């Protein structure tokens, strides 16, 4: 079975010939997916108005990416775009803290399957169950496996960091954290301090919020 991790395409010199990893998908299609997803995010997910973020800070906008990750047109784009974002990383499963991470991970699972590849998904509960198997992580076992932690967006980094800790406690190796949008509110610095590689698809400038 083929897993998703691959090395980027290189020239004869061993240097990548493009910023976009070679996935077998035409680069024009990758760019089109990214551009269309950005259009939908701007149209459906960005809410202007005074709001209080999870960090306690006030902001003049809110990025509600559940309107995207649970949208019938956008969800497949999320899967493909996120998959391309981390194509050069070697991992076998993807997941994060419920609820924001769940549709992102599932979209990536389906995108991999559509490409004839294998990618498992898992869900990290906010607390372990008090009944049944009393497990905190749902889905295929991740012990001894390399995993990617995902989230739709992160304000403080708390949710991905909690998910990463839970995954490690379950015996997994966490290779990186990836989100759809970065709000530039301190999450990147928290991930760096924790020794986690961090990637995101869109920044504030691309979202028209800088």
Protein language model annotation of sequence segments:
Residues 55, 139-143, 170, 190-191:
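Solvent-exposed alpha-helices and their adjacent loops that cap or buttress functional pockets
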Residues 80, 84, 106, 110-114, ...:
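Short, well-ordered alpha-helices that flank and scaffold nucleotide-derived cofactor binding pockets
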Residues 2-12, 26-40, 165-210:
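PRPP-dependent phosphoribosyltransferase catalytic core
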Residues 105-148, 155-162:
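Short, glycine/charge-rich flexible loops or terminal/linker lids adjacent to PRPP-binding catalytic cores
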Residues 87-92, 142-144:
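Short helix-loop-beta connector
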